[in-house]
Every structure is written in C-alpha cells, then in structure tokens.
C-alpha cells in the first residue's frame, strides 16, 4: 500500500470528485444509454410519421398510458434493488380496485366524499397485500418469487370471488372526470400523469438521497453485511414490499378512474411489463444497482414502440417482439459492461479472485 | 493481572445439535492489549467471536464488559458498547462506496427537519471517512466508487478503518491477514499496534503463528471449545503454541 503517493491527491480533490460522481450515480451509464435508445426510437417514428407522431397530442397519449405503470414501477424498482421481485402488483391493483369500487358502489353517491373513501380503501388494500408479502419474505423467509406468486393468485382469486367474476363499471364521475380523463387545470397535462410524476420524484429522492434508500441498496448489495452492521433488514424489507403494495393500491384507484371499470382480466401481464421496464432501465435483478429514472425510461420504450407501430401501420403485435429484444439486449449490455469493468480494474486493483495468486507488485 | 478486563467471558457454552462448539470457554482481554486467539479448525474461535460480538445466543455462561455483566443480544448492541468486529468476509456492501460503508447503520443525519426525514449529511460522513482512512494510512483512492471494484487490500482497509473508528472498547479481527500480501499484512499488523496504543483491546485471530508472536501481548489457545492455555507472547514459541493447539503438549502440562 503506497500511501504517500495517493492519499494527498484524493484528499485534496475529494469534494470535487464526489460531486461529479453523485451526478454519475443519478445518470448511471445504463439508464443513460437506454435514454439514447428511447430517443433514437422516437426520432425514427418522428421521421416516418412527422405529421402525427411527434405532436403533443400523441406524446400526451403516450405519457397518459405510461402513468399507471409508472406508479407500479416505483415500488418494483425498490423491490428489485433489494434483489427481490414482486409478481403480485397486477393482481394487487385489481383487488384494490375491486374493493374500492365495491365500497364506493355501496355508498351510492358519486361525489368527492365517496371518491375519497375509495382512494383510502384502495391504498389500504394494496398496503395490506404488501405487508403480507413483506412479512412472509422477511420473517417467514419464503423466497419473494414464491410469496408474490402466491399473493398474485390470492389477490386475483379474491377479486373474482368478491365480484363473481363480473367487472364493476360504476365509478364515481368525479374520479373519472378529474383524475381519469381530466387535465391539470390550465394545462393539457393529464392529471393522472401529474400524480405519477409527483410520486416518481418523491420516491426518486427517497431512493437516491435518504437513509431508507441507502438501506435498500445495502440489502440488495449484501444482506448479511447490512444485518451485521446493524441495519434492521427485516423491517426494511417489510417496508419496501408494503410500499410496493401501497403503490399498487394507488394504481388500482387510478386504473378505476381511467378505465371506469375494474378490468379484472386486464392486468395479467402487468407485473411482467413492469419488471421488464425496471430491468431495461438498468436495475439489476441481482440487487444493489438501480435508478427510478431508468425505470421511467424503461417504461417509455414499450409504450413508444406500441404507439409508433400503430401510427406507422405496423401490426402492434410486433411491439412485444421488439420489447423482448430490447429487454434481452439491455441485460446483455449490462453484463458486458460489468465484465469489462471487472477486467479493467483487475489490471491494477484486481478483484479478490486474483488476489490469492499474483499479488506481488 | 489485577486490572479488570475490558471484556471477559466465563464458561460460555453453545451447542449446535450434538456438536459442542463452546464447552465452558473462558476468555479475557484488557484495554490496550493485543490478545491473539488461536486454535485449530473447529476449536471454537469463530463461535466465540460471534458470541462476543452479539451474533450468537449462548446456552450458558457469562459475558462481562468492563466488569459488569452484559447480555449481547445483537451486533448493534455490541457496537453500542464499543465492541467492533472485522469479519473474515469483511461485511461490506460491494455496491456502496467507502464512505457509505463506513457509516452504514450509523449514518449522520442532516441537522433539523431534513435529518428527521431521513436525509444524510454525506459531506460530514465523507470528511470523517477520509480522516479515518488517513489516520490508518489506508490507501482508499476514492470515497465515491463502489467498494466492490476495489482491491482486496483496499476493502480490508475500509473494513478495518470502520471497526477502528467505532471501537471504543474491544475490536475483533477475524483472520485479517489471511488474504493479504506481504506489504498489506505488515500494514495490518502496524494498525493493530496503533489501535492498541489508543487503549482499545484488540483480539487477533490468526493461523499464522509468526504474526501472532510478532504482534500479540498474550496468546490464548482454544481447543475443543475450551481455553486450554494462555501464554505471554514474548515467552513462548511457535512450537509451544502449535503443541497447545493440537494437544501434543497435554502430557507435558501439569
């Protein structure tokens, strides 16, 4: 360890260095790359359909379509950063929406009072499922894949039991008019998108700036180490799955407002779409790495492809093919980048594997 | 030994199924002294360290900290008494940077409302981390790169610096030199002496007898879950230590 050479330099420039590094953390390489991919896709469609595609009306449509998935993507990012998974978000959304619709239906009127109760009920239902997930994962030590596969079935099944399998189509008009189709007063920005954006910003700050976020990364990075240094890992995991659940509850009421129906059968692939977006956005399934920003970009790629294909007259089914390819490519690029980083470092500061053999210089 | 040991274990037992990992083990370390804890594989060294760092519940036995009996229920409880451990696997989070690892679980909150909302004073933590690394002469080039991309020596330095910075009473080092080259090993041994000189009790676990004799003040030998011998490091030899570890000296001892 040649201390004298190195320390003064890094001590002197420490604050300047860290500034650029924290910026780099926010715009992590992969989420930045994927942003470029998104821009390229956007420009290609804009060139192919300059009259229709790049208009605010169309972009607004895309933003509106992505909003609900965006709310789910926040929770999923937290969960996947801990190297967990939450398959239950779609069913949880349906269940929360169904219970909220039932309660609002039984209250009869269609005013703000009813809508407010519906919001509370929906978020509480989502939170409940999330807590159940969290307790089973953190305390009962059942793997997240299995727990949330179980609650995926449980929530959807119960939603069908409650409704008899028939969608509820009575949703208070105020919800539909203001949140579902309404714009932010004075603008043409959908209210539902503003809600999603506010949540994205808040939880982006929570993930990247607060202790809660730091512990989320620490658990995903090395759960045992986190435990040993005194991070309350169980409590943190429960909170994270509860957050994911509560956001699914938020998405449940937003979905009701937007579509005016509980759409019980309409969310069967939502969980996988959200997971794909999170991973495309550069969050590692192995934990410890991820950004909310990347997730948002990851959500826009499928949405832009879908929208663009319809506009340029390609069968929209191609969207699934394209998203599949982007997903695999994103993970491939990430793997290569990490492998290259490991090799690059091994020239001077090798990884532990090489340390045993040839550490003589 | 008229002084009260800063940490003392009396008759610790712990079984895993039919295996008695600790079988009435005693142990003690004074402030400002390096105690080497040696023993063959399976002698109970790691189990003893786990018990004394709050990572393991005991079947029976007493742990005394500065003369008062304590029950170490969790690692954080041990930490709050000033007992720190450098684990063999270092217990770092590879995706976090050096400063974040340094303060993980003990972050400095920002003052006022922001702190209560969970915002951290990253600048203060970086400054203090840098001070801690400089104090140890540790080569940590970047405080903001993920620890996972650093060399084994740097990771080790971070883990040791973290323990040293927080240790007020006792510091356990579990095989700190096992994966290190010659230069880094000497650095770690120097660090151990420096920490001892600050008045902290250092417990040094190692299989390397020359290092043990080099750095330790006393050597305590564990065999089959029990302390079988204590030596003054200056008046012992590698042969004697190995004999005590393996039991070859049993006949010769009174």
Predicted features along the sequence, with ranges:
Chain B
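Glycine-rich phosphate-binding loops of nucleotide-dependent enzymes
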Residues: 2-254
